[in-house]
């Protein structure tokens, strides 16, 4: 479980990225790099670190399921992820 402050910071960054996405897109098309530089640093999507949606863990993140390997394994064993089952061959 990540610290609550890290999870809050991540959510705040996500909101900033969403808020400035259209503005950033227009400034890039117009090659207005001076105005682009004046936007908040956290509005840049490159600065976002993918985190687990359940507990905020930043490592071992699986993009397709938006969760860490630990939560993925736990939920898969419980059968709560549709279409996922243990492999056998």
Curated annotation (Swiss-Prot):
Keywords: Plasmid, Ribonucleoprotein, Ribosomal protein, RNA-binding, rRNA-binding
A Gene Ontology biological process term: translation
Superkingdom of source: Bacteria
Entry GO CC: cytoplasm; small ribosomal subunit
Organism: Ligilactobacillus salivarius (strain UCC118) (Lactobacillus salivarius)
Molecular function in Gene Ontology: rRNA binding; structural constituent of ribosome
InterPro entries, per database record: Ribosomal_uS14, Ribosomal_uS14_bac/plastid, Ribosomal_uS14_sf
Protein name from the UniProt record: Small ribosomal subunit protein uS14A
Family membership: Belongs to the universal ribosomal protein uS14 family.
Keyword set includes Ribosomal protein: yes
Task performed by this protein: Binds 16S rRNA, required for the assembly of 30S particles and may also be responsible for determining the conformation of the 16S rRNA at the A site.
Disulfide bridge partners, by residue number: none
């Amino acid at each position: 479980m990540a610290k609550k402050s890290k999870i809050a910071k991540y959510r705040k960054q996500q909101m900033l990225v969403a808020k400035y996405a259209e503005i950033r897109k227009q400034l890039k098309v117009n090659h207005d790099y001076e105005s682009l530089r004046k936007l908040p640093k956290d509005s840049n999507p490159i600065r976002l670190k993918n985190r687990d949606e359940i507990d905020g863990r930043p490592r071992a993140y699986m993009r397709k399921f938006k969760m860490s390997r630990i939560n993925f394994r736990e939920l898969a064993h419980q059968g709560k992820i549709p279409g996922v089952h243990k492999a056998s061959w």
